[in-house]
Amino acid sequence: MDEDEFELQPQEPNSCFDGIGTDATHMDGDQIVVEVQETVFVSDVVDSDITVHNFVPDDPDSVVIQDVIENVVIEDVQCSDILEEADVSENVIIPEQMLSSDVTEEVSLAHCTVPDDVLASDITSASMSMPEHVLTSESVHVSDVGHVEHIVHGSVVEAEIVTDPLTADVVSEEVLVADCASEAVIDANGIPVDQQDDDKGNCEDYLMISLDDDGKMEHDCSSGMTMDAESEIDPCKVDGTCPEVIKVYIFKADPGEDDLGGTVDIVESEPENDHGVELLDQNNSIRMPREKMVYMTVNDSQQEDEDLNVAEIADEVYMEVIVGEEDAAVAAAAATTVHEQEMDDSEIKTFMPIAWAAAYGNNSDGIENRSGTASALLHIDESAGLGRLTKHKPKKRRRPDSRQYQTAIIIGPDGHPLTVYPCMICGKKFKSRGFLKRHMKNHPEHLTKKKYRCTDCDYTTNKKISLHNHLESHKLTSKSEKAIECDDCGKHFSHAGALFTHKMVHKEKGASKMHKCKFCEYETAEQGLLNRHLLAVHSKNFPHICVECGKGFRHPSELKKHMRIHTGEKPYQCQYCEYRSADSSNLKTHVKTKHSKEMSFKCDICLLTFSDTKEVQQHALIHQESKTHQCVHCDHKSSNSSDLKRHIISVHTKDYPHKCDMCDKGFHRPSELKKHVAAHKGKKMHQCRHCDFKIADPFVLSRHILSVHTKDLPFRCKRCKKGFRQQNELKKHMKTHSGRKVYQCEYCEYSTTDASGFKRHVISIHTKDYPHRCEYCKKGFRRPSEKNQHITRHHKEVGLP
C-alpha cells in the first residue's frame, strides 16, 4: 500500500487504539486519554489477513494504527466497556485530523481530551451531543456517524447520516461529510477566525458547495450548505474520465453583504458566457467544462489604490472562476511558490478557519497570490459524490495567440455572469476592452504600439527608414496585381492615389502659362523666378540693386562685394603665398586650410588661429571683457542682455511659434522655418485619396488623413472629456485648465502662457534690431544661429568652428 494513501474497510465492532509509545494511552477513572502523533495512516482487517506495510499481526481481530514516519507498530489498547450514548458535559477540544476507530458500545466521558491526528473510523452510536464553545481545527475526519448534532457558538447544525462503516474519505468536517446518502446542513455563521494581523479587521470567508443526486452543484438560498450524493462507483476508475481544473480567484466585497454565496448555471449557447475551454483528461479525451460555477463571499477592509479606468465592480464580485488552465509562465511561478511553501510546511503550523479548511485542507499553499487576493487550484471530482477538494497542478498548455485579450467570468450578487478584461501586468480587471487599452498606458514599458503606420496597408514600425523601405515595396508591386495604367504615358501604378499624382505631372508639362510681374513688364514661365524678381527689384527690403543682373541687396557693402564678381577685382592677397580673393572671408578660409601649420595657436572660443601665444592672449581678452551677462541655467555668457534673452529663448524654452503650413512643424526662429520650407521643394508629392491635399512627406499625409478624414478622437481631456485628434492639441487645451496667466501680443493675435516664449515671439517677429554682425561682410542678424547659417551659406571657404 502506498504511504500517501490509506484504505478503510468495514469490520466487526471490535476496536483497538494503538498509541505512539507505551505511556501514550492510559485510562484514569472516567477519563480516557489517547495521544497520537500527526499523520497517522490506518489499515483494517480483511478476513483473516492483515497487512500494514507488509506487517502481519498475531491477533487478526485488531486494528493496527501505524506511524509511517518511524515505521513502528504500537501496542494495542482495547476498550471493552463502551456505552451506547456519549454525553459530553465539559468543553471538548478536538484538534486537527481526528480519526476514530470502531466503537461498539456506549462510552460516558465526563471530560475527554483528544490530541492531534486521531483517526475516527466507525462510531455506531445513535446520537452525539456537544455543548457550546467547541473549537474545531482545520480538518476533522468523521465517518459512519448515525446522527450528529453540532453546536458552534450558538448555531445548531444537525446532520443525519446513514451508517456505512469505514467508507469515508478524508474531508473537512465543517463543509463536507464523507460518503453520505442523507442531507447535511451546515451554518458557517459565527465561526471565529484566527486573525494574525490586528489592523486588518474582521474577515469572514464562506465557501458554498452543494451537490444533487447526480453529483452536480445546486444553489441553496439558505445560509448553509446542502449535500446529497451517493458514492458507489468512482467513474474516474471505470471510464478513465478525470475531473477538470478550476482556477479560483477571491476578490473583495463589502462587509455588509447578506448573500453568502451560491452557484449559477452557465449555458454554452449564451454568447456572453462563451469562455469555456476544452479540457483533456489523462487519456487525452475531451471533457466539456462543468455547467455550474461556485461563488464565495470574502470581506476585507483593505482597499486597493484607486484607478479611474477600473470598472466599478469591486463591491459586486464574489469569486472569479476561469475554466481552463494557466499559461506556462503563471504555472511555472505557481509551481515554484508551492514547492517553496512545502519546504517550510513542516516547520509552520497555523490555525485556519473551518471554511478555509474545506478548500485548502491542511496546507496554506496558494491562499494568496502576488496581488494580495486569495487563490487556489482546486481539483473537484463530481463522479465520486464526495465533493472532495484537493490540490491539483494543471498541465501546461500553449496559448494559441498571446495577443488575444484574456477574459474572465465574474459572478455578481444577482447571480449573472459578467465578462471582464484583466490586465496581464498588475491584475486589475475592466468591464470593456477600451478601458483595458487606456489602462495599459500606465505600463509604458510593456506597450508594443508602433510609431509609424503605412497608409496603404496595416504595416507598422518604430523606425522611419523601415517605413520608407516598406513604401518602396508598394512601388515594386507587380503590374499584374491590379495595376492601374496611365492613359497618357502607359505607366502602371499600384493604387489610384499614385496615378492621380502622376497625372498632375502631365498637366504641368502641358501648361505654358507665363507669370507676369504686376509692377513691370517682366514675365517668366516659373513662379520661383518671378518671386526672386519681386524681392530683388520691387521689395523695400532690397533697395540696392545691381545694374548688371538686377539682384537686390539690403546694404551697400553687400552690393559692393557683389560687383566684384562682374569686374573681376580681387583686392585681398595672402601674406604666405600669391593667393588673391575678392572677399576677405575667402582669404581667411584659405589661410586656415593651407597655412594652418604656420599658425598653430588657436583660440578655444572662436577657433581663430594665430602665429604666436601673445596674439592668442590678446585675442582672449576680447571674449572675457565682452561677456558679462551669465545665464542662470547654464554656463553661457553674453555681451549684452538682449543676447542673453535670445539664448534663454532658443535653448531653455520649448515653445515653437513658427509653424510650417505644409506639415505643421514648429520652429524657434523664422530662419529655421524658411530652411525647413525649402526642404519641401523638389520632393515627390503624395496625393490624399480623399481630397486635393498633397505633400512631399508621407508621414504628414498620414497625419492629415487621421486628423481630417477620421472621426476618432483618441486624446481626451480628463477634466472636461473633450476629444482631440492630436496630442499637441490636447496639451494646448490643458493649459486652459491650469489657470496660468496668458500673454497676448499687442501687435498680432499670438498668445501663450509661457513668458519666455512670448518674449521670443516679440523679439523674433516684431523687432528690427540686428545686433549680431558678420565678421566678414558686417551683415546684421537677430540671432547668432542666423549669423552662423549666413556664414555657412555665403562664406563657404571660411566655414563654422
Curated annotation (Swiss-Prot):
UniProt entry tagged with the keyword Oxidoreductase: no
Transmembrane segments: none
Keywords on record: Activator, DNA-binding, Metal-binding, Nucleus, Phosphoprotein, Repeat, Transcription, Transcription regulation, Zinc, Zinc-finger
Molecular function per GO: chromatin insulator sequence binding; zinc ion binding
Gene Ontology annotations for the cellular component aspect, listed alphabetically: chromosome; nucleus
Tagged with keyword ATP-binding: no
Highest taxon in the source lineage: Eukaryota
Gene Ontology BP terms: regulation of transcription by RNA polymerase II
Function: Probable transcriptional activator. Binds to the consensus sequence 5'-AGGCCY-3'.
Entry note about domains: The binding of ZFY to DNA is mediated by the interaction of the GGCC core base pairs with zinc fingers 12 and 13.
Full protein name: Zinc finger Y-chromosomal protein
Taxonomy of the source species: Eukaryota, Metazoa, Chordata, Craniata, Vertebrata
